Amino acid sequence: MKLIVFAGGTLGHICPAVEIIKQIKNKYSNVYIIFVATEKDKNYQIIKNCISDEIKFLECYSIKSSIKKNIKNIKAYQELKKLIKSKQITSAIGFGGYISGIGIKAAQSLKLKTFIHEQNSIMGLSNKLVLKKVDNIYLSFPITKYKKTTVVGNPVYFKAENLKKNIYKERNKMLFISGTLGSKEINQLAVNLIRGKHLTNYDVTIITGKKYYQDVFKLLKNTNTKIYEFSNNLIEQISSSEVVISRAGSSSLFEIIGTNTLSIIIPSPNVTNNHQYHNALYFKNVGCIEMIEENDLSINNFLSKLNILINNKEEYYKSMRNFKIDNLIDKMIEEICQ
């Protein structure tokens, strides 16, 4: 059996794909897997460590891009059809990103079994383009308006849940993270809180993203703050923290909940269909997180939410422990690999 896996653009798409590849290999070592991502994803350590049999990188873009870029999308589509034929691939699964939409379309044109996994609470564009012809749609959140769906959660949740048993949570450790691209607003909030001496009771770590590292480092170099551009062990960083401040990407949220970590979530408004807000709202409504919308972000609002979180921490811990998704990942893997 030969499987092709598509994911790219952000770690939110890539991390669940890599985790599923790992689990497939652990269960069915004879399954041959090709992982396809975009050229821009080449430097991610998680891809370098991926245990697929082959890894391919292709240049592709949003279908809303220029004519020149869409010509490259057509080229990627044609290359993927050739690859699927030459390798005699039997099944394909996409985890989102432009490469996923193009790849699943190519697989469908060749009458392969196809599947998609949606990490967010609102279906992404790439998945929307192909969902009518896929054999099954695997969901992280219970989105009820689509047929042929199975709610399996985000694969990183179960990894995080297992990890929390082995990592000691450091009291008073506060972690600021802001997604693959980094966040000016979250980094600025962290800087203002530290320079204003509002977090003197906390051991603060900031993962800034490449774009903001130098600026944050210069502003805080004379403090005890730990500042990193990127982390290859983010899930361990989350698990060891008492409080995490984060964007509302699906993988980050499921890692936070899975490791039973207190959090203040600041959804990015600059995403398709405002899906981060809806991701965060889902967990807010079940009592697992505190949330601040970016328009309401201020030091006073943050400190107010932090006080609520700390003063009621046992209630949040209980809600996170009570949050349960049936682990249907094994069922998903069996269906893909039939």
List the predicted regions and their residue ranges:
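Conserved nucleotide-sugar phosphate-binding/catalytic loop shared by glycosyltransferases and other
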Residues: V5-L11, N26-K72, S178, I292-N295
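Active-site-proximal region of nucleotide-activated glycan assembly enzymes
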Residues: K2, Y32, Q108-L163
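An amphipathic, basic-hydrophobic alpha-helix
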Residues: K64-S91, S109
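C-terminal "capping" alpha-helix adjacent to the active site of nucleotide-linked donor transferases
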Residues: V286-E314
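A short, well-ordered alpha-helix in the C-terminal region of glycosyltransferases
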Residues: E314-D326
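Acidic donor-binding loop of glycosyltransferase active sites
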Residues: I89-T90, S239-F254, T261-L262
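C-terminal alpha-helical cap of glycosyltransferases
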Residues: I308, I325-Q338
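Donor-nucleotide binding loops and adjacent catalytic segments primarily
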Residues: F35-V36, D41-I51, E161-V243, Y277-A280, ...
